[in-house]
């Protein structure tokens, strides 16, 4: 088949004309989907290897999610005024999250519509807590991490540093730079530098720390080093700094656990944020926090948080992911990916591989080659049964995050196609070198 086809080209043209300029790059348009397989408006098929940056962890057209949506629609309640009176499904979801998450107990939950909103709520909780404690002028600083990503709304732009020239620089009044501290992410390579920078800080002036765990996603799937992380935790904890853990891309089974940071039994966040896969494709965000950090009445609220459809689906997602974890399915995906990707270690187009659970990155020599690999993957369906839906991460990496429900056969096909795409890229690059 031709890619992009006639219908796809028409929609892409209309998008350029009528939709705002955002981050859209892919030419793969989803007309229908089934687990890991996407079909576009022209009938081309693709294997999804990034799940909408970790949203569709249970794949597309998941029967459990479809059934949950249908069951809620049959009640006639699509919107409940959860800001005005409790919605039973939102309370059930909150109870489950509060009871099982690693946040210090007792804990509470605030539901919203996205990861950015979840992180905004986390920031507001910390600031309100310091305000009521009479510490707003004493603890006014915040620790963030280089190459981090916390969302695109104004309040969390200070913590979003993965591509500041486009994410932050146009919004010149976006944060108080003097009160934002940027540390290297706690990897083994950064351990000594991180210790040095921590020793130079007046930690008594710091309100909060926001960190993605167990790895940075948008930065290029950068796993934290546990020893370095534990040192950071100990030093900042003893200084009274509030810990916000962002498990938005890493959570809901992606690294083999529900909350991502529960890989570290010694870590007890004050606040934990979730979104993406929690909603099974529907908008949702969750901010789980120590109960004593709670707002005073009226200090924070929203219109659509605790939506009954999203809440019912989230309960279903949590149950399904628990089953996948218990069955060893996610571990098998991790082992299969490790085994196949290890064979690429000497490939001329591969500079590095890293990951955890079902969340991996392959780093290429530069951004141009990475972007060309994405195009090659999309175009493979013209000669193969499937093309590949790939997504970049960081400056020059590809993230590989298949659905946690992907069949062994489809995963094998996808990894075979990925190797073929790398080989095509290698051949193109060699030909370019010869011609120049």
Residue locations for each model-derived region?
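Conserved N-terminal phosphate-binding loop of PLP-dependent enzymes in the Aspartate aminotransferase
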Residues: 1-436
């Amino acid at each position: 088949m031709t890619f992009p086809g006639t219908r796809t080209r028409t929609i892409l043209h209309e998008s350029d004309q009528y939709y705002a300029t955002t981050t859209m790059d892919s030419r793969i348009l989803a007309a229908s989907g089934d687990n890991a397989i996407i079909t576009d408006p022209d009938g081309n098929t693709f294997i999804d290897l990034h799940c909408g940056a970790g949203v569709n962890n249970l794949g597309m057209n998941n029967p459990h999610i479809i059934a949950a949506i249908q069951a809620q629609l049959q009640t006639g309640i699509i919107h409940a005024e959860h800001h005005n009176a409790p919605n039973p499904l939102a309370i059930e979801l909150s109870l489950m999250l509060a009871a099982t998450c690693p946040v210090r107990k007792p804990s509470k939950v605030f539901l919203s519509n996205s990861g950015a909103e979840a992180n905004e709520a986390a920031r507001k909780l910390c600031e309100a807590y310091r305000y009521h404690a009479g510490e707003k002028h004493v603890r006014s600083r915040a620790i963030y991490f280089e190459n981090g990503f916390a969302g695109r709304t104004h309040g969390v732009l200070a913590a979003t540093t993965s591509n500041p020239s486009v994410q932050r620089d146009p919004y010149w009044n976006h944060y108080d730079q003097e009160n934002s501290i940027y540390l290297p992410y706690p990897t083994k390579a950064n351990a000594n530098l991180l210790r040095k920078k921590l020793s130079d800080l007046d930690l008594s002036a710091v309100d909060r720390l926001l960190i993605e765990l167990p790895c940075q996603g948008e930065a290029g799937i950068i796993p934290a080093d546990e020893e370095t992380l534990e040192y950071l935790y100990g030093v900042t904890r003893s200084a009274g700094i509030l810990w916000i853990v962002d498990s938005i891309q890493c959570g809901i089974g992606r690294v083999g656990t529900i909350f991502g940071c529960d890989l570290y039994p010694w870590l007890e966040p004050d606040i934990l944020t979730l979104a993406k896969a929690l909603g099974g494709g529907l908008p949702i965000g969750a901010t789980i926090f120590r109960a004593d950090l709670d707002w005073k009445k009226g200090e924070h609220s929203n219109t659509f948080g605790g939506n009954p459809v999203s809440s019912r689906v989230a309960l279903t997602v949590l149950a399904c992911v628990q089953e996948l974890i218990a069955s060893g399915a996610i571990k098998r995906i991790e082992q299969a990916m490790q085994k196949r990707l290890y064979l690429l270690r000497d490939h001329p187009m591969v500079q590095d591989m890293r990951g955890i659970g079902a969340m991996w990155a392959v780093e290429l020599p530069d951004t141009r080659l990475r972007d060309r690999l994405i195009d090659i993957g999309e175009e493979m369906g013209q000669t193969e049964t499937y093309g590949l839906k790939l997504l970049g991460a960081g400056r020059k990496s590809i993230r590989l995050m298949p659905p946690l429900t992907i069949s062994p056969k489809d995963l094998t096909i996808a990894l075979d196609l990925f190797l073929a795409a790398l080989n095509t890229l290698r051949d193109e690059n060699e030909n370019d070198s010869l011609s120049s």
